[in-house]
């Protein structure tokens, strides 16, 4: 099998990564018409998420505000919001990450209506809706793995209750996750990856698998 030449993105919002590689598989994945993150009923918030220590610090700095928007039964002790298990990881700006805790079958910030308390707080207080959310919460189902942009597979791509890859699919990951791509890459980076996807449609890359 011929070696696949990896596409490199130089326009993006990740200051700790100079050249962001694109996983060839995300150029090949196709989904059914109508698949959309807006319609997603997946279970990503049933688990915690890894977050950069700076994201953690920002959440703790707004702890008193966030508590006002928690359900009564949600955890109000800030010391129990995180795993306190620091790991070293090159895909996080600080090089270190922690994880949000899981309580009652979901992320500690997931309320009884399936809403994120962090996003709920930000919207109610006039902030950008993503101001308090960890990077990988907003980016999901896109992830950075070894400075490579890819999808959280099989978490995203093979869900029986959500979007799944199909052989005769007509829409791409970019179609499904445009807002998430723009969050990671910025407006210029979005234009750059749009060109990459258009090139793939014109001349499909060979699967790396």
Language model features by range: what are they?
Residues 1-209:
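Short loop/turn segments that flank or connect secondary-structure elements
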